[in-house]
Amino acid sequence: MFFKKVKKADLEAVSSRNADQERQENKMMRAWISFGVVIILLILLFFASINIGSLKVGFGELLSGLFVKYNKDVATIYDLRFPRIIISMLAGAAIAVSGVLFQAVLKNPLADPGIIGISSGASFTAVIITAFAPTLYFFTPIAAFAGGVVAFFMVYCLSWKGGLSPMRIILTGVAVNSLFTGLSSALNSMSGGDRTGVAAIVEANITQKTWDDVTTLLPYVVAGLFLAMLFTQECNLLSLEDKTARSLGVNVNVTRIVISLVAVLLASISTAVAGAISFLGLIVPHIGRILVGSNHKMLIPFSAFFGAFT
């Protein structure tokens, strides 16, 4: 009788392990399918966006005009539409991954570069350069990054009270966001510089963007996404209690600051070039967790693709 009970318990344990393994395999399958669908949709969106407007070309004509023989219509699309499409995709990817990193660092599911004031801080310093020193346009991304860092540490310090409270972070972030948004509006009204450039930053308008803006944005976004992928394991560990993370060998404070700087870089640079984009960094990570899970090794690259699509 005793051996029958032991055998039954062993069979139940094996059955439970098999069920868990099957669930994990199903999750991984769903994650890879989600990756494939988003990548396909992103490619389709890219080619569909090329033909949005009065000027339209076929796919074969586009390839021929790009690589074989000069075509006036294709050249126009290449000069005008390609930069806007690429900038919107790069900025979307950067903002989405920035949201993932902020939510991991702050342990707050509502953390978003726009909500907690990072985008408005970056926008403010970018507006200063654009409005009063347009000849220093090359330094706009650096100025935006500095503004984003200042905004982040304002939120971090003002919301700290024996620890980080999600509610205090959001309330402080809203206040910092309002402060920098008001300052940007004031600078816009009193500046004598490039009003169009200032409006483009504040309103996220990419209609005037060129290949120069692409070359400005691309290296920063690629570097930021590469750094984000280097910290996937740390992001997973930061989701644990700080004591647990420290016991696993993580220097919590230093790791939190470094990952925050990567998130600020992504959000600030995209804001400087494409303008302030709200809620993308909030929504995309949550959709990503539903589709691919909470493991940042999957969540970060998926959010980049889905943010570019969105």
Annotate each language-model stretch with its function.
Residues 2-310:
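Alpha-helical transmembrane segments in inner-membrane proteins
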